[in-house]
Amino acid sequence: VPSGSMKPPILPGDRIVVDKLAYDLAVPFTWVRIFRWGEPKRGDVVTFDNPQDERLFVKRVIGVPGDVVELRRNRLFINGDKASYEPLGPDEIAELPIPNASSHRFFRESVLGDSRVIMVNRRATGTYSTFPPQEIPAGYYLMLGDNRDNSSDSRRIGLITRDRIMGRAHAVAFSVDLDKYYLPRLARFFTDLP
Protein backbone atom coordinates (compact mmCIF):
# COMPACT_ATOMS: atom_id res chain seq x y z
CA VAL A 1 0.00 0.00 0.00
CA PRO A 2 1.70 3.22 -1.12
CA SER A 3 -0.42 5.86 0.65
CA GLY A 4 -1.93 6.68 4.03
CA SER A 5 -5.49 7.06 2.75
CA MET A 6 -6.72 4.09 4.81
CA LYS A 7 -4.98 4.96 8.08
CA PRO A 8 -5.33 3.84 10.82
CA PRO A 9 -6.14 0.21 9.85
CA ILE A 10 -3.85 0.11 6.78
CA LEU A 11 -0.49 1.90 6.73
CA PRO A 12 1.84 2.81 3.87
CA GLY A 13 4.16 -0.18 3.46
CA ASP A 14 1.54 -2.78 4.43
CA ARG A 15 1.17 -5.77 2.13
CA ILE A 16 -2.45 -6.82 2.41
CA VAL A 17 -4.17 -10.13 1.76
CA VAL A 18 -7.08 -9.79 -0.67
CA ASP A 19 -9.69 -12.50 -1.21
CA LYS A 20 -10.35 -12.27 -4.94
CA LEU A 21 -13.03 -14.95 -4.63
CA ALA A 22 -15.03 -13.05 -2.01
CA TYR A 23 -17.69 -11.91 -4.46
CA ASP A 24 -17.17 -13.66 -7.78
CA LEU A 25 -14.96 -15.64 -10.13
CA ALA A 26 -13.29 -13.59 -12.87
CA VAL A 27 -11.17 -14.35 -15.89
CA PRO A 28 -7.64 -13.37 -14.75
CA PHE A 29 -6.43 -9.90 -15.81
CA THR A 30 -9.88 -8.93 -17.13
CA TRP A 31 -13.16 -7.54 -15.82
CA VAL A 32 -15.06 -10.53 -17.22
CA ARG A 33 -17.00 -12.25 -14.42
CA ILE A 34 -17.73 -15.94 -14.91
CA PHE A 35 -19.89 -16.40 -11.83
CA ARG A 36 -21.06 -14.01 -9.11
CA TRP A 37 -22.07 -15.26 -5.64
CA GLY A 38 -21.88 -12.20 -3.45
CA GLU A 39 -21.94 -8.43 -3.33
CA PRO A 40 -19.74 -6.02 -1.38
CA LYS A 41 -21.33 -4.96 1.89
CA ARG A 42 -21.22 -1.63 3.64
CA GLY A 43 -18.02 -1.58 5.72
CA ASP A 44 -16.05 -4.04 3.56
CA VAL A 45 -12.49 -2.99 2.72
CA VAL A 46 -12.11 -3.69 -0.99
CA THR A 47 -9.59 -3.29 -3.79
CA PHE A 48 -10.64 -1.84 -7.12
CA ASP A 49 -9.26 -0.34 -10.32
CA ASN A 50 -9.38 3.46 -10.28
CA PRO A 51 -11.48 4.40 -13.34
CA GLN A 52 -9.31 7.47 -14.03
CA ASP A 53 -5.90 5.85 -14.34
CA GLU A 54 -6.31 2.09 -13.73
CA ARG A 55 -4.23 2.13 -10.51
CA LEU A 56 -5.28 -0.38 -7.86
CA PHE A 57 -6.93 1.32 -4.86
CA VAL A 58 -8.01 0.03 -1.46
CA LYS A 59 -10.94 1.78 0.28
CA ARG A 60 -13.93 1.08 2.48
CA VAL A 61 -17.41 0.54 1.01
CA ILE A 62 -19.65 3.23 2.51
CA GLY A 63 -22.63 3.27 0.13
CA VAL A 64 -24.20 0.29 -1.63
CA PRO A 65 -26.82 0.35 -4.42
CA GLY A 66 -30.02 2.01 -3.20
CA ASP A 67 -28.38 3.90 -0.32
CA VAL A 68 -28.70 7.67 0.00
CA VAL A 69 -25.36 8.94 1.33
CA GLU A 70 -24.47 12.43 2.51
CA LEU A 71 -21.38 13.92 4.15
CA ARG A 72 -21.66 17.14 6.19
CA ARG A 73 -18.36 18.47 7.55
CA ASN A 74 -17.00 14.90 7.74
CA ARG A 75 -20.23 13.66 9.39
CA LEU A 76 -21.73 10.71 7.52
CA PHE A 77 -25.45 10.16 6.92
CA ILE A 78 -26.71 6.95 5.29
CA ASN A 79 -30.41 6.61 4.43
CA GLY A 80 -31.16 9.45 6.83
CA ASP A 81 -29.33 7.81 9.76
CA LYS A 82 -26.60 10.01 11.19
CA ALA A 83 -23.41 8.19 12.11
CA SER A 84 -22.31 8.47 15.73
CA TYR A 85 -18.77 9.62 16.45
CA GLU A 86 -17.13 8.55 19.70
CA PRO A 87 -13.71 10.16 20.28
CA LEU A 88 -10.96 7.66 21.05
CA GLY A 89 -9.36 8.02 24.45
CA PRO A 90 -5.65 8.71 24.97
CA ASP A 91 -4.91 5.03 25.67
CA GLU A 92 -6.66 3.91 22.48
CA ILE A 93 -4.83 6.55 20.43
CA ALA A 94 -1.49 5.46 21.93
CA GLU A 95 -2.14 1.93 20.63
CA LEU A 96 -2.62 3.13 17.05
CA PRO A 97 0.45 2.78 14.81
CA ILE A 98 0.24 6.44 13.75
CA PRO A 99 3.25 8.76 14.09
CA ASN A 100 2.35 12.38 14.90
CA ALA A 101 -1.09 11.31 16.12
CA SER A 102 -1.48 14.68 17.85
CA SER A 103 -2.11 16.38 14.49
CA HIS A 104 -5.25 14.29 13.98
CA ARG A 105 -8.51 13.50 15.73
CA PHE A 106 -9.63 9.87 15.95
CA PHE A 107 -13.22 8.70 16.18
CA ARG A 108 -15.13 5.45 16.26
CA GLU A 109 -17.67 6.03 13.49
CA SER A 110 -20.80 3.86 13.76
CA VAL A 111 -23.77 3.77 11.41
CA LEU A 112 -26.34 1.09 10.54
CA GLY A 113 -24.57 -1.59 12.60
CA ASP A 114 -21.14 -0.99 11.08
CA SER A 115 -18.25 0.56 13.01
CA ARG A 116 -14.70 1.65 12.20
CA VAL A 117 -11.97 4.00 13.47
CA ILE A 118 -11.45 7.05 11.26
CA MET A 119 -9.02 9.94 11.46
CA VAL A 120 -9.46 13.58 10.49
CA ASN A 121 -6.89 16.36 10.35
CA ARG A 122 -7.22 18.86 13.19
CA ARG A 123 -6.55 21.81 10.86
CA ALA A 124 -8.27 20.72 7.66
CA THR A 125 -11.52 22.27 6.61
CA GLY A 126 -11.42 20.29 3.38
CA THR A 127 -13.38 21.01 0.24
CA TYR A 128 -14.25 17.31 0.17
CA SER A 129 -15.59 17.15 3.74
CA THR A 130 -19.13 17.84 2.51
CA PHE A 131 -21.28 16.51 -0.32
CA PRO A 132 -25.07 16.62 -0.77
CA PRO A 133 -27.34 13.56 -0.49
CA GLN A 134 -26.58 11.18 -3.33
CA GLU A 135 -28.53 8.03 -4.18
CA ILE A 136 -26.24 5.19 -5.17
CA PRO A 137 -27.53 3.67 -8.45
CA ALA A 138 -27.70 -0.06 -9.16
CA GLY A 139 -24.28 -1.51 -9.93
CA TYR A 140 -22.33 1.30 -8.20
CA TYR A 141 -20.60 1.75 -4.83
CA LEU A 142 -19.41 4.77 -2.87
CA MET A 143 -15.91 4.33 -1.40
CA LEU A 144 -14.20 6.43 1.28
CA GLY A 145 -10.80 6.19 2.92
CA ASP A 146 -10.65 5.97 6.72
CA ASN A 147 -8.18 8.90 6.65
CA ARG A 148 -10.99 11.23 5.62
CA ASP A 149 -8.96 14.38 4.92
CA ASN A 150 -6.22 12.59 2.97
CA SER A 151 -7.90 10.14 0.62
CA SER A 152 -8.52 10.09 -3.10
CA ASP A 153 -11.83 8.25 -3.03
CA SER A 154 -15.35 8.53 -4.47
CA ARG A 155 -15.41 12.21 -3.56
CA ARG A 156 -12.72 12.75 -6.23
CA ILE A 157 -12.89 9.81 -8.61
CA GLY A 158 -16.65 9.18 -8.54
CA LEU A 159 -18.69 6.10 -7.79
CA ILE A 160 -17.12 2.72 -8.54
CA THR A 161 -18.87 0.17 -10.73
CA ARG A 162 -19.29 -3.34 -9.37
CA ASP A 163 -17.15 -4.84 -12.15
CA ARG A 164 -14.11 -2.78 -11.05
CA ILE A 165 -14.12 -4.32 -7.55
CA MET A 166 -11.42 -6.97 -7.46
CA GLY A 167 -11.80 -8.45 -3.97
CA ARG A 168 -12.12 -7.96 -0.21
CA ALA A 169 -9.05 -7.19 1.92
CA HIS A 170 -9.00 -9.00 5.25
CA ALA A 171 -5.47 -9.03 6.69
CA VAL A 172 -1.98 -7.53 6.67
CA ALA A 173 0.49 -10.20 5.53
CA PHE A 174 3.58 -8.15 6.35
CA SER A 175 4.58 -4.54 6.69
CA VAL A 176 7.66 -2.37 6.16
CA ASP A 177 8.23 1.18 7.35
CA LEU A 178 8.77 3.28 4.23
CA ASP A 179 10.22 6.14 6.30
CA LYS A 180 12.79 3.94 8.06
CA TYR A 181 14.65 2.26 5.21
CA TYR A 182 11.99 -0.45 4.80
CA LEU A 183 12.54 -1.91 8.24
CA PRO A 184 9.94 -4.58 8.98
CA ARG A 185 7.10 -3.69 11.35
CA LEU A 186 6.91 -7.14 12.93
CA ALA A 187 3.93 -6.29 15.14
CA ARG A 188 1.79 -5.85 12.00
CA PHE A 189 2.69 -9.21 10.42
CA PHE A 190 -0.34 -11.52 10.01
CA THR A 191 -2.85 -9.14 11.63
CA ASP A 192 -6.54 -9.00 10.73
CA LEU A 193 -8.11 -5.83 9.37
CA PRO A 194 -10.98 -4.45 11.44
Roles of regions detected by a PLM:
Residues 1-6:
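Aromatic-capped interface at the extracytoplasmic side
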Residues 7-194:
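Soluble "head" domains of membrane/secretory-pathway proteins
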